[in-house]
Every structure is written in structure tokens, then in C-alpha cells.
């Protein structure tokens, strides 16, 4: 079946009522821009990772068909049997906005539009929604346009912005998880190929623990001392009398974090701040990772031997005790 009629070859098009108008008519510009937006939303649906976002975007695409049909008709009100935009659709957009914005950190400056493909496409669609809104405002100076349509298109651009932020946030968090997993797997592979002798001996474990206890006694700070091997498995845990109960949880986590991330825990502090590369790491690791001082990776000849975690005093005291203990044996805190 032919899709061409040749009736538009002269630069005119027909409205639903049969009236022919110029293809540059504000009414045609308005629903034509909605058509552009709908096509862009198809790309958004394909790129979005969140299934709820995809379903919402498909619903919006259907609603834009109703919207365009209303603009292509000269009737001031939609026919009773016609599907049309109502306050219900606006409420759904507002609910989606609130949900998406409730999941992302606040912004204090302008951002580049989109760090992921889905967010980039959503931001592009947002600009088309804004253009459609401008065309609708222009059209409203010539004909009567239902106010609910103005509200809907205004809210739609906000919704696309919120979805873009949420898609970016999810992509960033997934990237963090992937990086942590890669580092952890790399640590496992390294441990599987290292020389059997390249681990802390019983004498070194004893010396490390003893040096930590002696320094803690000098500072009059009861602490918990935890040492893990290169696989993150605990080899030594020593709790001094009167050490805080919470320290029995924190010290092993500090030691494990130092091995998993191959770095001292205090060096992670800046990396997990909002906007930094590892922001959200702690929540995604369900509290297993510690990002304040007291945990150190233990290296020798470029190989990771294990990790030391101290908890019980202030961050500075924990770091002091750990560094004093490390100085007592032949290891480094950096590769």
C-alpha cells in the first residue's frame, strides 16, 4: 500500500477536520515538535536501564499521541470518545519526578547533560519537550489551548530531567560496584599466583600485634587489633581490656577494606564524597567498607601480604598505633 498521497506536495497538510493549512502553521509546528519528541523517547526507552523508567516512557509516548491528536483538531475540547491528557497523567509525572529526585544527591551547580547514554538521550528529549512547550505557548496566542496541556508539557520536561539524573546516578553506582569487584578479583588472582612464602609469618603477626598493643598502652587507648591475609580472611584479632564493643566490628572491617581496595582507609575519605569517583561505595557495600583512618594494606616487594585494622581511639590515634606497629616489621603501606 502506498504511503504517499501527493496532497502535501504544495506545502500544506490536512487537520483532522479536513481543513488544509500550511506546514508552517503554529498548530502543525506544535504537534510536529511533539512528533520529534516522541521519536526521541523511543531512543530513551531503548537506552534506559531502569525497567520502571522504560514503562513510564512508553506510557508518555502514548500520551503524546493523544496530545498531538488534540492539537491536530480544531475542536476546543476533545470528543467524548477521544483519549486526552488529564490531571491524572500530570499526577503520574509528578510522582515519577519525586521518586527519581529522592534517589539522587542534590546539585549545587550546573552539570553537563548526561554521563551515561540513557541520561544523554533523556536530556536531549528534555530539550525537545521545552521546544514543544514554546510552540504550544506560541499557538495559544492564536487559538484556545486547554490549560492542562500547558501543565502537562511543562511537567514532562521536568520529568525527563529527573529520569536523566536517576539514570546517571544508577550508572555511576554500578560503575563503582564494578570497579570494587574488579579490584577484589584482581587481589584474589594475585594471591593465587604469589609465592607461598610471601605472607606474614607467625613471628611477624605476633610482632605486629605486640607493637600495636605497646603503642596503645603508651597512649592509654584500649583498642581492637585485627590482621587479615591477602584474601581478606582474619588471621589475628586481639581485643584489649575495656576496648569499645563497636571496635570489634570496625577493626576487621578496616583491615578488610585496606586489602579489598589495596590502600589505606583514610585515603578513601575524599574519594567517597558527593561527586567523587567512589561516592556511594559505603552504602552499596552494605557497611562492609570503612573509609576513615585506621586500616592499612601491608606490602612487601610489590606483593600484598594482608591488612591491619586498628579501632578504639580517635582516627588519629588509631592511625598512630597502626603506623607504629607497621614500622616494627619489614612491610610497606603502599605498593
From Swiss-Prot:
Converts cob(I)alamin to adenosylcobalamin (adenosylcob(III)alamin), the cofactor for propanediol dehydratase. Found in the bacterial microcompartment (BMC) dedicated to 1,2-propanediol (1,2-PD) degradation. PduS and PduO allow regeneration of the adenosylcobalamin cofactor within the BMC. GO terms for biological process: cobalamin biosynthetic process; propanediol catabolic process. Keywords: ATP-binding, Bacterial microcompartment, Cobalamin biosynthesis, Heme, Iron, Magnesium, Metal-binding, Nucleotide-binding, Transferase. Pfam families: Cob_adeno_trans, HbpS-like. The keyword Protein biosynthesis does not apply. GO terms for molecular function: ATP binding; corrinoid adenosyltransferase activity; metal ion binding. It is found in: Bacterial microcompartment. This is Corrinoid adenosyltransferase PduO. Its cofactor is heme b; Mg(2+). The keyword Cytoplasm does not apply. It catalyses: cob(I)alamin-[corrinoid adenosyltransferase] + ATP = apo-[corrinoid adenosyltransferase] + adenosylcob(III)alamin + triphosphate. The gene is pduO. SUPFAM superfamilies: Cobalamin adenosyltransferase-like (SSF89028), GlcG-like (SSF143744). It comes from the Bacteria. Forms a complex with PduS. InterPro entries: CblAdoTrfase-like, CblAdoTrfase-like_sf, PduO, PduO-typ, PduO/GlcC-like, PduO/GlcC-like_sf. Coiled coil: none annotated. Belongs to the Cob(I)alamin adenosyltransferase family. PduO subfamily. Pathway: Polyol metabolism; 1,2-propanediol degradation; Cofactor biosynthesis; adenosylcobalamin biosynthesis. Heme binds at residue 206. GO terms for cellular component: bacterial microcompartment.
